[in-house]
Amino acid sequence: MSQEITKEQIAAFDADFSAQRANRVAMNAVTNNGLLASAIRREAVEQDVHEYSISLEQGEICNQKQSGRCWMFAALNTLRYQVMKKYDLKTFELSQAYLFFWDKLEKSNYFLESILDTLDEPANGRLVSYLLMAPVNDGGQWDMLCNLIEKYGVVPKTAYPESKASSGSREMDMTLTEKLREDACILRKLHKEGKGLDELRTHKTRMLGEIYRLLCICLGEPPKTFTFEYRDKDNNFHREEGLTPKSFFEKYVGVDLSDYVSLINAPTEDKPYGRSYTVQYLGNVKEGSAVRYLNLPIEELKKAAIAQMKDGQPVWFGCDVGKHSERDSGIMDLDIRGLEDLLDTRFTMTKAERLDYGQSLMTHAMVFQGVNLDENGKPNRWRVENSWGKEPGKDGYYLMTDRWFDEYMYQVVVNKKYLTAEQIAAYEAEPIALEPWDPMGSLAVVR
């Protein structure tokens, strides 16, 4: 039997609030300054110093602006590092908008194929409702980025610059979403009328042609060939004509993407360590590789990330960026705010419980560009390259404490040479398929 809130209970709550002087002080501070600003702990800001024993050089900070392309920016920032080193460049940027174009087209096909795969599922059931929720969101995963590059290559930003729709994707995404939901409705109606799969796929091809046209209008036509011109650090001018996106990747980037694997830390009962996982209905390029993770203890993620940076290579990662972080200072620290003291309450959930109860998930991808190791070789803070421009943090860089890493870091991508033979075998084993709405797939459904 349910129980309502009574007047007597409210009177008791009010008396308890009024009896504590600290409640009045907290109320005045929060109502005038806001909850999070009132809780900033000065000592945490003073202790978190942006200096690191291992610090990699990097180009100018990028800015994803009003879009959910963090995963793409982070991945391309790790790849541009190779170009800058190889060709002695002060800075360089690969076109995020170019891969954004193809990602939207591929996601549209992936969505429509998923609709064809679920024609007999109820439209208001959990699965189809989930698919319809965000057909072409901006988010993604490392493996999805690799699929795009292997199929379409990459281009420098000068060959395909940003557009209004790539820097602020909301209007385009809303239009694409409406069109794809309409397409899903049409395909399901045709199925109910008894039309066969071949006829439905004919309709799907027409639908994709319309999506392609919309993308060209919003983002511009992607280049088939282009000229690459640049100056090195010594101001020497270079030009190469007739490049294609794939030949540019092969010559100027030259990274074997198959060497890299995703490690996650998901300490929940349903995901034993030492096993590989995938997420159902998560992807973009239909014929590409499935998203795959190896679940390991958090110390293994740290060990692999540090080893890769010691070899001079940055590390792509996924985390829950909004928890215990302060945008202006760029500090990610469990002690950055004293909310428990301010509110006289306690937050006691473990990392596993936060995942199980919807309190935390992967929300943002960035790049590790350094780490500070203490006298025992243990990390105590990590240097983070963000993609929110130069204003937040220290010239666009964030600082992550090692304790924050423990609680809100979920994924790193590293070269498999930093794994043991046993770990590689576990990664390559048949993955366990997680539900589409599992928190380990959340980075790819950023909306």
Language model feature labels by segment:
Residues 2-59:
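N-terminal regions that are enriched for targeting/export leaders
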Residues 374-447:
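Conserved catalytic-core surface of thiol
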Residues 291, 301-307, 353-358, 367-374, ...:
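Generic recognition of flexible, low-complexity loop/linker segments
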Residues 321-326, 331-349, 372-375, 382-392, ...:
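Active/binding-pocket-proximal capping segment
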Residues 70, 149, 356-389:
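Catalytic nucleophile-His microenvironment captured as a short glycine-rich beta-strand/loop
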Residues 47-315, 392-395, 402, 410:
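Active-site nucleophile-adjacent alpha helix/oxyanion-hole segment immediately C-terminal to the catalytic cysteine
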Residues 73, 317-320, 369:
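Short His-Asn-centered micro-motif
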Residues 288-363:
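Long, positively charged binding patches that form subdomain-scale interaction surfaces
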